Amino acid sequence: MKQLEELLSTSFDIQFNDLTLLETAFTHTSYANEHRLLNVSHNERLEFLGDAVLQLIISEYLFAKYPKKTEGDMSKLRSMIVREESLAGFSRFCSFDAYIKLGKGEEKSGGRRRDTILGDLFEAFLGALLLDKGIDAVRRFLKQVMIPQVEKGNFERVKDYKTCLQEFLQAKGDVVIDYQVISEKGPAHAKQFEVSIVVNGAVLSKGLGKSKKLAEQDAAKNALAQLSEV
C-alpha cells in the first residue's frame, strides 16, 4: 500500500487519514473470499457510496456547465461519462489497476484488465475518499481526472452502443430488436443483470451490467463486435 499512498500523494495531492478505508477500496471480493479467516473487507459497500457521489457531482457539473441542455440530453451525457467502460479507463489513467487486490483465480482469468472490476474500483475509491476527506475532496479529484475529458467534448462525440446497433441493423432492412433480461443476481447494492438481444426472434448477443441499461449497452457492444467480424 505504500506505493499506492505515494502515487496518490505525488499525482493527486491526496493523503488518506484512514488507510484502512483506502485498503478496503482496493480489495476485490475475490481476494476477501480467499482470506475469510483474516476477516478481510472488500470494496462493494464503498462502490455503492462512490457511485452515488459520482452521479451527484457529475449531475451538478452538467447542470451548471450546460444551461441550455435538456434533461434528456444531460442524462444521456452523464450516462456516457459514468458508464463502466469510461470509469475503467479512468482507473487505468490513474494507474489504479496496478494496486487492486484480487483472488488468485480472478488474477489468472484476467480480472486486472476487466472493465467491470476497474470501474467498480474507481467508484470504491471515490467512496473511500468521500468518507476520509469529504465531498469537496472528491470534487477536486474528479475535476483533475474526469472533467478535462468532458471539457474536450470526448463523451459528446460518442454514440451509445444501442443507437449504433439500431442504425446498423435498420440500414439492412426492417428488423425487430428486443432486449430481454435473462437473469438478475446479487444483493440490492451489487446487482448483476444479464440481458440478451433478440433480433427477429433469434438471439444475437448477450451482455452483463450492474443495471439493465448497462447490460443492454454491453449486449449491444458485443453484437456490434460480432457483426463487424461477419
Curated annotation (Swiss-Prot):
Source species, domain of life: Bacteria
Record text on subunit structure and interactions: Homodimer.
GO cellular component assignments: cytoplasm
Name of protein: Ribonuclease 3
DRBM domain residues: 160-229
Ranges where the RNase III domain occurs: 1-134
Main location: cytoplasm
Role played: Digests double-stranded RNA. Involved in the processing of primary rRNA transcript to yield the immediate precursors to the large and small rRNAs (23S and 16S). Processes some mRNAs, and tRNAs when they are encoded in the rRNA operon. Processes pre-crRNA and tracrRNA of type II CRISPR loci if present in the organism.
InterPro entries registered for this protein in UniProt: dsRBD_dom, RNase_III, RNase_III_dom, RNase_III_sf
Membrane in keyword set: no
Cofactor(s) required for function per UniProt: Mg(2+)
Catalyzed reaction equations: Endonucleolytic cleavage to 5'-phosphomonoester
Active site, per annotation: 51, 123
Enzyme Commission (EC) number: 3.1.26.3
Enzyme category, top tier: hydrolase
Molecular function terms, GO-annotated: double-stranded RNA binding; metal ion binding; ribonuclease III activity; rRNA binding
Similarity comment: family membership: Belongs to the ribonuclease III family.
SMART domains: DSRM, RIBOc
Keyword vocabulary terms for this entry: Cytoplasm, Endonuclease, Hydrolase, Magnesium, Metal-binding, mRNA processing, Nuclease, RNA-binding, rRNA processing, rRNA-binding, tRNA processing
